[in-house]
């Protein structure tokens, strides 16, 4: 049974990173089931009165898992109001108008929080199993070599993929859009996080297996080195370490590169603390040098360019992470004690978002900030307790050990833990399913390296646990097995059912048979995954189409009960209430939808349309103006202008509502031109010059559009003045200089035109238009 448990242990350790980082729901389910079955088989191997070993930090880790479950289960509303007033307010404002409630959870998305509880329960069992299994010295040595080999193979694949790739993982999986995949990972930062944990361990093994050939001639030393198995393994581990470090640099993960460098400094420092390790310190430094030389062979230009993107034209360090972290401060302030529920960042963040753009933000890109905002102070303290307990138990034992293998392996594993902790300052590695598993493997490895005895009859310095601990472990494992089987099995089944009808358009023209099939499928999906709000929301939309108002309301209530901060559901509820002539309720839910997704222009446009229909033009104007500021794309601005025109607002009024930027004026002009108002379009374009000082997103073509209007009217003086203003903002821009030369030529000032053409050729020597212009002017000069 113990061998079966060990095989499962190795399987999940290898499978998770190779399965695209175990990001797919099926891969996560396999990970969780493997962890629990591995624990079951190990417990079955403990016959009679035999008990497992005590595991450092298991109590705080178990309490952390319990805290996640506690966040997800319904509690008396009065208790929630007392410990988390902000959570109570959300449920009161978003769910209260539809139904009275007396029990609510601390989490604003209990389904996500419970899923995180299951994930960390699997990690807990895996950590426990790692400590138990690696107390066997043979399994310990075998496991670390298997992991080193896995990381080496992944590094080779990542490097080859970087050089010869079709843009897909394994040649067939494209991964999600807007992500840069490296190796088998869909996100390059997660790949570098994985390698950052494993590389120090591999270097530790590399140092341990260094052949001890200190006497004899150089020839004898070389022969002894190549004839021994240790010498071969030493070279293989060193080669793997160089490949792994090189692949981190080639991944272009800035956080990964920085954390790798910091971890190497720490590893050298740790070896410096022990006497007689100066040679090992030199070997680590040599490995780092070889990594840098290897990167030089591939070229530093992409890496330098990647780091250069972190600075703007003025040399200031800019990154959207800073904005997200600043926004998260508001979340921490509102949910300081209990958090919003671990795993709910993506759901709650839109209500605090000030980040420009419409790109979805799923995580804080800082695991510590996300833990504090979603897990609260209670969750943070439990995590700190676990880390302190782990460090105290392992460091104290490491200091007592005299075995070089224990020293090298412990320092390598401990440095790997530090590497992921460094990286987590700027990324969300603990929300990578595979990296979370590997982190707890490294924790278990640190315990095993410091406690497992490599000689003698006694396996480990770990103490045996009591029979009570064994029974508690059995109960936890069996309960988790049942719950995760039901939860993951139901989630996978519900997802498969939903995929059958996802994208199906249900309307009044849909046949009864088709609509009945859709409703039945969604009912089953909601049955198999009762904590997923997407299925009740879909049912509410279907019933609303067929005028089943009470059924639609019931399913909307259920969706809000499961996630009261979903702005899509809140907005649909507002529309539902408005159609039933409940204007006060409709307005309330429109306001809640905007409040929980303030940076989404679509929420504001929908609310503004409702306000315009109700005759509340002033408030609608404010929302539309904000919507245009949030998204300055042509489609969005045109949609806002069209909405105002549809509701009968005058063109002058609409122009006055535009944001104080240039581009919205151009879109307004294009819209007016399409409706045949050419003079109004001309005026809008020319008046855009009044907003130069207000616009921080000026582009050269903004000036050129105004310039063309004057050139069409043959007003060369005004056209020239526009180009001169453009040169103040974009000095040396070849296109602006070229147009300036053309304008001077039309004005009959050839020598000034020649000067401008010459300036163009200084910046762009191959510019054909400037060269041709100078040739034409040669007869005049």
Q: Where do the model's predicted regions map?
A:
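TM-adjacent membrane-interface loops and short helices in multi-pass inner/ER membrane proteins
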Residues: 71, 130, 187, 322-361, ...
């Amino acid at each position: 049974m113990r061998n079966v448990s060990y095989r499962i242990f190795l399987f999940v350790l290898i499978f998770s990173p190779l399965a695209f980082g175990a990001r797919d729901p099926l891969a996560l389910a396999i990970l969780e089931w493997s962890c629990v079955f591995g624990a079951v088989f190990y417990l079955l191997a403990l016959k009679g009165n035999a008990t497992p070993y005590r595991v450092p930090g298991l109590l705080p880790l178990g309490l952390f898992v319990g805290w996640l479950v506690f966040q997800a289960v319904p509690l008396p509303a009065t208790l929630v109001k007392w410990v988390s007033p902000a959570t109570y307010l959300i449920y009161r404002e978003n769910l209260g108008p539809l139904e009275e409630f007396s029990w609510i959870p601390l989490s604003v998305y209990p389904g996500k929080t419970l899923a995180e509880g299951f994930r960390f329960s699997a990690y807990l069992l895996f950590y426990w199993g790692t400590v138990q299994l690696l107390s066997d010295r043979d399994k310990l040595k075998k496991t670390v070599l298997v992991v080193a080999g896995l990381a080496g193979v992944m590094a080779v694949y990542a490097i080859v993929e970087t050089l010869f790739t079709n843009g897909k993982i394994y040649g067939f999986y494209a991964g999600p859009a807007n992500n840069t995949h490296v190796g088998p990972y869909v996100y390059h930062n997660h790949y570098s996080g994985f390698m950052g944990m494993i590389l120090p361990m591999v270097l530790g093994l590399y140092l341990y297996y260094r052949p001890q050939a200190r006497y004899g001639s150089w020839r004898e030393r070389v022969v002894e080195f190549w004839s021994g198995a240790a010498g071969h393994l030493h070279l293989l581990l060193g080669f793997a370490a160089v490949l792994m470090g090189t692949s981190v640099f080639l991944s272009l993960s800035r956080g990964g590169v920085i954390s790798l460098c910091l971890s190497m400094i720490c590893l050298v420092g740790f070896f410096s603390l022990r006497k007689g390790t100066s040679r090992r310190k030199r070997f680590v430094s040599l490995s780092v040098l070889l990594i840098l030389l290897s990167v030089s062979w591939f070229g530093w230009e992409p890496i330098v360019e990647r780091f250069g993107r972190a600075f703007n034209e003025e040399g200031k360090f800019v990154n959207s992470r800073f904005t997200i972290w600043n926004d998260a401060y508001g979340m921490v302030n509102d949910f300081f004690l209990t958090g919003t529920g671990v795993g709910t960042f993506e759901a709650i963040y839109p209500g605090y978002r000030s980040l420009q753009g419409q790109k979805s933000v799923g995580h804080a890109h800082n695991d510590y900030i996300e833990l504090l905002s979603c897990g609260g102070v209670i969750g943070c303290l439990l995590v700190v307790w676990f880390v302190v307990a782990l460090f105290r138990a392992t460091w104290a034992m490491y200091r007592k050990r005299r075995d070089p293998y224990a020293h090298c392996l412990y320092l390598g594993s401990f440095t790997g833990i530090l590497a992921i902790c460094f990286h987590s300052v700027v990324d969300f590695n603990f929300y990578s399913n595979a990296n979370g598993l590997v982190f707890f493997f490294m924790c278990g490895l640190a315990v095993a390296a410091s406690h497992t005895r490599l000689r003698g009859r006694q396996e480990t310095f770990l103490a045996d646990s009591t029979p009570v601990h064994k029974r508690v472990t059995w109960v936890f494992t069996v309960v988790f097995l049942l719950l995760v089987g039901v939860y993951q099995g139901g989630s996978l089944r519900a997802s498969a059912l939903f995929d059958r009808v996802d994208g199906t358009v249900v309307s009044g023209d849909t046949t009864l048979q088709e609509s009945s099939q859709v409703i039945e499928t969604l009912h089953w999906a909601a049955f198999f995954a009762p904590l997923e709000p997407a299925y009740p929301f879909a049912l509410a939309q279907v019933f609303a189409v067929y005028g089943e108002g009470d059924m639609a309301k019931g399913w909307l209530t259920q969706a809000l009960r499961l996630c009261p901060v979903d702005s899509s559901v809140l907005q649909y509820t507002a529309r539902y209430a408005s159609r039933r002539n409940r204007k006060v309720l409709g307005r309330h839910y429109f306001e809640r939808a905007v409040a929980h997704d303030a940076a989404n222009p679509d929420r504001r446009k929908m609310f503004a349309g409702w306000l315009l229909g109700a005759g509340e033009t002033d408030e609608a104007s404010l929302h539309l103006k904000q919507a245009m500021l949030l998204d300055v794309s042509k489609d969005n601005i045109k949609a806002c202008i069209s909405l105002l025109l549809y509701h009968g607002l005058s063109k002058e009024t609409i122009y006055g509502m535009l944001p104080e930027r240039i581009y919205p004026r151009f879109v307004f002009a294009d819209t007016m031109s399409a409706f045949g108002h050419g003079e109004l379009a001309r005026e809008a374009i020319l008046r855009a010059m009044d907003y130069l000082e207000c616009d921080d997103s000026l582009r050269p073509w903004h000036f050129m559009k105004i310039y063309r209007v004057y050139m069409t009217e043959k007003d060369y003086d005004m056209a020239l003045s526009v180009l001169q203003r453009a040169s103040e903002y974009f000095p040396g821009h070849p296109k602006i200089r070229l147009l300036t030369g053309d304008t001077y030529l039309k004005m009959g000032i050839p020598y000034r035109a020649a000067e401008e053409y010459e300036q163009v050729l200084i910046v762009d020597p191959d510019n054909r238009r400037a060269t041709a212009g100078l040739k034409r002017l040669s007869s005049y000069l």
